[in-house]
Amino acid sequence: MKEEILQKSLKLFLEHGIREMSNQKLVDWLGISTKTIYKYFKNKEDLLEQVLYLYHDGQYEMLLSLSSEQNAACHFFNVWQIAVQTEYNVNHIFYEDLHHYYPELGKKVEGVIAKKFEEHFLSIIERGIEQGAFRKDILPQVALRSVLTLHRAAVRTEDFKRFGLSAENLLLQTTASYIRGLCTETGLDALDEHIQSL
């Protein structure tokens, strides 16, 4: 029952935002009693925290399912393709609510999950440098921070919504352009061929 509550609550938070989903609305949508929700969660913040971990764990599992046998530039592109596709349809109010009403919780969860995500991303960049897919003169941590910043701006704010881009075009016009700049000629050829095959 707890897992079902988490899964359904995650869907509701992502679609409607956090603030919009009061405990009463949650129990109404979930078809359970308030008593049931408090059996598993201390309060809405506790529920939200566990929902955030569920969300990030799911994303991390998707990343690990990608083949690391492919060219690192293509692998790195696929990572961000999944990220954009996943977050593209999330209501931007979800991120605004998290930042505005639950900033400490957002920082806490980010602090717990960030390290494993960043280590995974950095390992792909470093493998790309070793393979010759990425330029040797790039600083992996700076490159990663740039991609993370660009990604957040592209999918978690309204800045790019006005262009009416599909998830794929948003990726190609933002993050993919930056990834192409990290590439050597060999990496760029492989990446362009990979993108054309999609």
Label for each model-derived stretch:
Residues 8-12, 82:
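Short amphipathic alpha-helical elements of helix-turn-helix/winged-helix folds
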Residues 66, 94-98, 154, 158-161:
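Secondary-structure edge/capping motif, primarily at the C-terminal ends of alpha-helices
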Residues 50, 61-93, 144-147:
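Hydrophobic alpha-helical connector segments
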Residues 123-127, 164-198:
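C-terminal peripheral helix-coil segments that are non-catalytic and often amphipathic
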Residues 77, 122-126, 140-148, 192:
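Short, well-structured alpha-helical segments
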Residues 88-122, 129-134, 141-142:
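Short secondary-structure transition hinges
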Residues 1-9, 26, 51-55, 59, ...:
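Generic hydrophobic, amphipathic alpha-helix propensity
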